């Protein structure tokens, strides 16, 4: 009855009799996702849930939603949605849940588990009212609270479509918390919901069957994510180093520009200094030239005065006939004084010249100015000990270390020869000395256990055919193919001890002391160096004999 009253209208709106509200008909999920992306492109810092609620309030109008976010009125709309949901939860505590709410009443962990199933469902299930419900249709008995829960589920779906990796990590975290809280309670709740709501029986049964498998898969994925987290941590560390390296590289380019700028400034300063020096020299030259002109003028003036005085004295000598005796004495004294000052005339001519200390000036010019060279304070980093240990722990170094600790071949062969009986064939001796660089492994009969490589046998080990097989095995081990493989070194290392025990068994048999029940090693396989199992009939015959 409620479904008939809540049918879709062609006008794009739906009247819900339960909540007495007019709801907009949202359309398909893809259309809603396009609207969410359109709002997210303009308002990137808002969550999908907030965008969906505001879109629902404005009848899925993108322009009004964006305007509400930009003006700040969207917070009031979100508060209205939150208050309405709380009131409805208080009223519906004691009411029985409708048939369409089991998937909404399940904890968040079950939502996260069933998200992938709901995404793989046909698009016809998502084409219900506004595209927000999970189970395919919404009844009239559902309130705004169930609608908001459906919107949260839709936001989770949108986040998974946008970022599948983050959604998978969130799913793993939720599943892990669900497993810690107890899987049995969760299964009991799911079985209870299954018994109450018979209309959802096939779907809930399928979920309850697939839930343990999904949980085990998620737990296995959580175990596999432990090294993944370690690798992410290492990658984050190397990302920090890469960022530091990038900053240093950018700073190197900047320092290169700084060096060029400093060089240009220094060259400009140098040219300016020498230009000042040149101007100073030119000024000094001009000053000296002017001074020389003054000196020349002064000297010429002095000489001119001397010339005039000489001419005056000469005129007086012409009238000396008319002078008295006293005047003549004065004239002779003046001439004598004039002539005595002749040396000053000579000094005057020598003083009027330019003198300078060019060498001192050259030395000062040579030492003029200093250029500071860059100091290379960089050094090479010494390698860490961890890198050295890693390099030493390589397989080649390990094999080299094991070969260096092996015993010397002469001591092995001499020890083996002393333990052989007189009746031992030389083939066994050749077999014992076939591997000179393998250490002597001494095995006591009481400490041996019947496992890999040792089985109790009878006198059959002293059989000539068996000795021939051992001899052929010794020759086979001496071949280049067997000695070249590093994976077979564990099998040849037991050869000296085996030959000693075989020699003791053979000597006991030839001396007639009885059949030796001491276990001897079986013949190794020719393919991979593993012990070869003999038939059980040979063992029973050896025991009976």
UniProtKB/Swiss-Prot annotation:
Residues 85-96 have a biased composition (Basic residues). Residues 106-123, 369-378, 491-514 have a biased composition (Polar residues). One of its GO terms (molecular function) is RNA binding. It is found in: Cytoplasm. Residues 379-415, 475-490 have a biased composition (Low complexity). Residues 85-137, 197-216, 369-545 are annotated as: Disordered. This is Spermatogenesis-associated serine-rich protein 2.
């Amino acid at each position: 009855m409620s479904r008939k009253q809540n049918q879709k209208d062609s006008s794009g709106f739906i009247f819900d009799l339960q909540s007495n509200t007019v709801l907009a008909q949202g359309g398909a999920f893809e259309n809603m996702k396009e609207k969410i992306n359109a709002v997210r492109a303009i308002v990137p810092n808002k969550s999908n849930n907030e965008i969906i609620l505001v879109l629902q309030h404005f009848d899925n109008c993108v322009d009004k939603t964006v305007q509400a976010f930009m003006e700040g009125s969207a917070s009031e709309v979100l508060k209205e949605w939150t208050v309405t949901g709380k009131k409805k939860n208080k009223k519906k505590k004691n009411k029985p849940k409708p048939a369409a709410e089991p998937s909404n009443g399940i904890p968040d962990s079950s939502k996260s588990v069933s998200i992938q199933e709901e995404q793989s469902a046909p698009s016809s299930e998502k084409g219900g009212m506004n595209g927000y419900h999970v189970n395919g249709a919404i009844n009239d008995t559902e309130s705004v609270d169930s609608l908001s829960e459906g919107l949260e589920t839709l936001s989770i779906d949108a986040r998974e479509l946008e970022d599948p990796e983050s959604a998978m990590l969130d799913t793993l975290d939720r599943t892990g918390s669900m497993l810690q809280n107890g899987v049995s309670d969760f299964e009991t709740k799911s079985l209870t919901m299954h018994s109450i709501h018979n209309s959802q029986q096939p779907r809930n049964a399928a979920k309850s069957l697939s839930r343990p498998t999904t949980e085990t898969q998620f737990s296995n994925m959580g175990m596999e994510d432990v090294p993944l987290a370690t690798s992410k941590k290492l990658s984050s560390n190397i990302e920090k180093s890469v960022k530091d390296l990038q900053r240093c590289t950018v700073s190197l380019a900047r320092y290169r520009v700084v060096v060029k700028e400093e060089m240009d400034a220094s060259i400009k300063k140098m040219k300016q200094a020498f230009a000042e020096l040149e101007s100073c020299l030119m000024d000094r030259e001009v000053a000296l030239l002017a001074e020389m002109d003054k000196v020349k003028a002064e000297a010429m003036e002095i000489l001119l005065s001397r010339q005039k005085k000489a001419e005056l004295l000469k005129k007086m000598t012409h009238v000396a006939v008319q002078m008295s005796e006293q005047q003549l004495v004065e004239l002779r004294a003046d001439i004598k004084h004039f002539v005595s000052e002749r040396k000053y005339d000579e000094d005057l001519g020598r003083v009027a010249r330019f003198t300078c200390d060019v060498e001192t000036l050259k030395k000062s010019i040579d030492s003029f100015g200093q250029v500071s060279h860059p100091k290379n304070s960089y050094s090479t980093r010494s390698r860490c000990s961890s890198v050295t240990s890693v390099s030493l722990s390589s397989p080649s170094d390990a094999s080299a270390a094991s070969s260096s600790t092996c015993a010397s071949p002469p001591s092995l062969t001499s020890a083996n020869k002393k333990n052989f009986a007189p009746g031992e064939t030389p083939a066994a001796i050749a077999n014992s000395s076939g591997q000179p660089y393998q250490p002597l492994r001494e095995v006591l009969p009481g400490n041996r256990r019947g496992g890999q490589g040792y089985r109790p046998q009878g006198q059959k080990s002293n059989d000539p055919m068996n000795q021939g097989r051992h001899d052929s095995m010794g020759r086979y081990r001496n071949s280049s193919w067997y000695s070249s493989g590093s994976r077979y070194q564990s099998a040849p290392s037991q050869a000296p001890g085996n030959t000693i025990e075989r020699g003791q068994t053979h000597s006991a048999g030839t001396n007639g002391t009885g059949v030796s029940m001491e276990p001897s090693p079986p013949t190794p396989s020719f393919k991979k160096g593993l012990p070869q199992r003999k038939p059980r009939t040979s063992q029973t015959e050896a025991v009976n004999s």
